[in-house]
Amino acid sequence: MKLTFLGANHEVTGSCTLLEAAGQRYLIDCGMEQGKDVYENQPIPVAPGEIDGVLATHAHIDHTGLLPLLVRNGFQGRIYATKPTAELCSIMLRDSAHIQEFEAEWKNRKGQRSGAEPVEPMYTIQDAEAAIALFRGYDYNKEIELAPGVIIRFVDVGHLLGSSSIEIWVTENGATTKLVFSGDIGNLDQPIIKDPSYLKDADYVFMESTYGDRSHGPRPDYVAELAKILQRTFDRGGNVVIPSFAVGRTQELLYFIREIKEKNLVTGHGCFPVYIDSPLAIEATRIFKDTDSSCFDEETNALLAKGIDPIQFPGLKVSVTSDESRAINTDPVPKVIISASGMCEAGRSRHHLKHNLWRKECTVLFVGYQAVNTLGRSLLEGADNVKLFGESIEVQAEICQLTGLSGHADREGLLKWVNSFEPKPKRVFIIHGEDEVENIFAQTLTEQGFNASAPYNGEQWAIGSEGAVCLKEGTRIRIEHHVSEGAARAATVFQRLLNAGKRLLRVIEHNEGGANKDLAKFADQINALCDKWDR
């Protein structure tokens, strides 16, 4: 059999791998890039019409977002996924298509003034509908024969509702080889969903490495941390804008805010309003509520048994239409605004940033991973100004992050997952990580006795029961991006350090009036850091 690595290699987004085995061709994921590409992408080396099926690990757009384009270009096979993944993709792919059409329309309106050629959307709602019709949803832990010699099974990996690792058994010439694609490995103790399952055997493993170079550290009290952020922002008279992934993270936030309200952890602001300003997040929340309880963890099922909706509470409001969304920023009452997209690359979150970033009393709270070259990453790294809808916006709001709040396992979680295989796989391919992170994690596994490597886009391997051989090296050609003067300055490592210093000053200002004990501890930590690095 043959494996070709097509996307999310030395990058985090755009997952796609081609498996050619037993006379069949399957893609494992078919994801969209989010943020600017780092390395040149490789085209799928076969015509879409010659692909027999797609195996989707989970519903996030960086794993499924190019399925409508694949269908548009001639794919007619089945798309295999868990039942919740199929349900979530039915809304997420429609939403993605809407964004493609909207952005093309906006560019065409703008381009008419300069005589530019019309822009076509990458794909349309009709393409998304056609892709959705090809989905087939399955239960966890059920063996599915795709074709003679190819059997798969979805196993809960605890990243998102419906997320899975995929076990693949390929039988050729009387010999069976087992592959495991990890999908995105979940963090431990997330609300609502179960922890990752651990597998025992595989010949070859293809695993993500998003946080392969770092630890999330001790699990914070997210409810208490979030309550503090809400309290100090509301006390200043500001809004808390939370750019959030519509699926998964939004529902997790609702779970936390329900607990905050139940325990009255934010005082002096009554039944403060919380807006879900994302039609996609609203639909995803409905799917969460309708999902079979077997997909939920014990704590969530215990709440349901008591008649408590774990993601519903007084003051929760939804805005579906554009008019409802715009009205949010005309209301002076301090509020929480949860809006997609989580990396601020599209969607209504960009409008809320435009209206709130320049206000010192407001807070922008990041609650998820921010990929390189995204607006969210720039804000976290201390950008002073950002451009939104053609306007330069000064960053005056407090910028903060719920650290450790992640749907991805950290280094320890990844190591726990891969060390569950006994004996060790013949080879572990490291994918879905930033450039240097993949190299670091591959080296970590090598030091622990694994045969590990981090392929680049376009790399091709022949694998079987007797071993693996690299047939073609991947490309390491970096894409040169035209960047503005401000973006170029921010790209330097030293500038990142300067930006971090500016952010520290803002954090110090935000702590004015805090308890003396906390301020003294904060000062000691800063002085200790200065003593370490003062040269």
Where are these regions (language model features)?
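His/Asp/Glu-rich metal-coordinating catalytic cores
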Residues: 1-55, 60, 64, 69-252, ...
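Short, surface-exposed amphipathic charged segments that create phosphate/polyanion-binding patches used
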Residues: 150-154, 287-295, 415-417, 465-475
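Short, compositionally biased "basic patch" segments
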Residues: 191-206, 293-300, 370-396
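A general structural motif
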Residues: 185, 218-223, 312-324, 343-345, ...
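C-terminal, active-site-flanking charged/polar segments
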Residues: 359, 434-477
